[in-house]
Amino acid sequence: MDDEEETYRLWKIRKTIMQLCHDRGYLVTQDELDQTLEEFKAQFGDKPSEGRPRRTDLTVLVAHNDDPTDQMFVFFPEEPKVGIKTIKVYCQRMQEENITRALIVVQQGMTPSAKQSLVDMAPKYVLEQFLQQELLINITEHELVPEHVVMTKEEVTELLARYKLRESQLPRIQAGDPVARYFGIKRGQVVKIIRPSETAGRYITYRLVQ
């Protein structure tokens, strides 16, 4: 892949990551959300083949709007298939900086032992992997994807009381659903899905993540 194409891909991927962080409630500036390809090149370079940028230069650290101590790393490993050694390096950095959540943007995937290490570290350290291919477009901007809103515990309690339901009676959505992964929705959370409706203006459904 030539430098121009690779620079474009890295810009698109980082832009989606910034939108994802923002949509999860982390503090991202408008400049970062709106960064143009030219601005990306000025900041990071346009010769990936010569290490400008190296993927590690794209690392992101964001703090949550509601709680500045709730921080999240986004790592961009160099190797196409990520091994356990890299995961250990990331975990050590997270321990040193007292950060418990991270996203890892991988080119081709992870080795089985690296994948297993993510499972072993949960729930103390939550590391989510995304294939870079998934981030070339922002799935939530697709016109067929309705708006998803993660509900607070209080909102869920109120919802169940209003409709006299038990949580187990709610319809389900898989934690592996692409939109659920984008928002980092965990098992046991409830998501409100808002669709436009020609008759009712908007049509709201609720899903329990499993």
UniProtKB/Swiss-Prot annotation:
PROSITE patterns: RNA_POL_H_23KD. There is a cross-link at residue 81 (Glycyl lysine isopeptide (Lys-Gly) (interchain with G-Cter in SUMO2)). DNA-dependent RNA polymerase catalyzes the transcription of DNA into RNA using the four ribonucleoside triphosphates as substrates. Common component of RNA polymerases I, II and III which synthesize ribosomal RNA precursors, mRNA precursors and many functional non-coding RNAs, and small RNAs, such as 5S rRNA and tRNAs, respectively. Pol II is the central component of the basal RNA polymerase II transcription machinery. Pols are composed of mobile elements that move relative to each other. This is DNA-directed RNA polymerases I, II, and III subunit RPABC1. The gene is Polr2e. Keywords: Acetylation, DNA-directed RNA polymerase, Isopeptide bond, Nucleus, Transcription, Ubl conjugation. GO terms for cellular component: nucleus; RNA polymerase I complex; RNA polymerase II, core complex; RNA polymerase III complex; RPAP3/R2TP/prefoldin-like complex. It is found in: Nucleus; Nucleus, Nucleolus. The lineage of its organism: Eukaryota, Metazoa, Chordata, Craniata, Vertebrata. Its main location: nucleus. One of its GO terms (biological process) is tRNA transcription by RNA polymerase III. The modification N-acetylmethionine is found at residue 1. SUPFAM superfamilies: Eukaryotic RPB5 N-terminal domain (SSF53036), RPB5-like RNA polymerase subunit (SSF55287). Gene3D superfamilies: RNA polymerase, Rpb5, N-terminal domain, RPB5-like RNA polymerase subunit. One of its GO terms (molecular function) is DNA-directed RNA polymerase activity. Belongs to the archaeal Rpo5/eukaryotic RPB5 RNA polymerase subunit family. It holds the Pfam family RNA_pol_Rpb5_C. It comes from Rattus norvegicus (Rat). Component of the RNA polymerase I (Pol I), RNA polymerase II (Pol II) and RNA polymerase III (Pol III) complexes consisting of at least 13, 12 and 17 subunits, respectively. Pol I complex consists of a ten-subunit catalytic core composed of POLR1A/RPA1, POLR1B/RPA2, POLR1C/RPAC1, POLR1D/RPAC2, POLR1H/RPA12, POLR2E/RPABC1, POLR2F/RPABC2, POLR2H/RPABC3, POLR2K/RPABC4 and POLR2L/RPABC5; a mobile stalk subunit POLR1F/RPA43 protruding from the core and additional subunits homologous to general transcription factors POLR1E/RPA49 and POLR1G/RPA34. It comes from the Eukaryota. The keyword Transcription applies.
